[in-house]
Amino acid sequence: MGPASFVTLEKWTFIHYSGDMRTASRTAEHVALFRALETRRGDRLFADDYATRFLPARYRWLVRAATFAPVGKGIARIIDHRYPGGPRMSAIARTRLIDDLLAEAEPEQVLLLGAGYDSRAHRIPGIPTTYEVDHPATQQAKRHRVKDQAHIHYVPVDLNEESLAHALADFPRKRTVVVWEGVTNYLTEQAVDATLRDLTTITAPGSTVIFTYVDRAALNDDTPWHKGVAKVGEPWTFGLHPAEVPGYLAERGLDLRGDLSAKEAAVRYHRDEPAADFYRIAWAVVR
């Protein structure tokens, strides 16, 4: 790997959606980059051949270089060193875990909240009708890069400004798997509460809600990951104490079925690479 690789990686800044097209697309790009790099590994946890489509030229050449295994490993090490806390492996582990949970549930339909550049509706064979809810800027950028398909319905919405129930007024009330990945920690407490309550009314009993969240204790921690998002004006605004999650969900009509940290998920898939204890993946069933 040449010096240019180090220069490019050192300049990364992790930014999350704030309603601005630039920040919306950069967040999705970084997750897509992690997925594209993972896809090039011989021991990959999943194959996302769509991820590269969402990347700008400055990242695509990294992905091409990563096809050569030693280079791919080197890129991963640089990312993990530059951004302690494990954002790369946390994203990879959660992607595989959610893929598995989705397959196990065998839903009648799928709802992707804050879909970003999630390609599950395209890459998972036989996936049922899928509704993608996201900020209009990110959704528009995504649709420029993939073909519309009959089983995919796009719903542009900002959950900090509009209720999910209003946005999905015509949503069929069927047994659904809801995937809410990488979003809650950037929303307000009121938005998370309202969305969970809406989900129990618009989906059928027995539906599965899969969501990620950060341990509330991490909201005040001086971690490099947290400092990075705060530095660019996107601090984490919502978290839950894991011990409180069962009760929190029960009050909103959901029964918790599982809750793993990203680190635990990485261990489940035999990956001894940095992943976060405070970044968590939970899944619950609608009563």
What residue spans do the PLM features occupy?
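Core SAM-dependent methyltransferase catalytic element
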Residues: 268-287
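Conserved beta-strand signature within the Rossmann-like core of class I S-adenosyl-L-methionine
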Residues: 203-216
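Short, glycine-/aromatic-enriched active-site segment of Class I SAM-dependent methyltransferases
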Residues: 220-235
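A short SAM/SAH-binding and catalytic strip from SAM-dependent methyltransferases
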Residues: 175-191
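A short, conserved alpha-helix within the catalytic core of class I
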Residues: 164, 186-198
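Short amphipathic alpha-helix with an adjacent loop that forms part of the alpha/beta core around
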Residues: 163-172
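Rossmann-like AdoMet
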Residues: 11-111, 117-157, 170
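Short alpha-helix
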Residues: 237-259
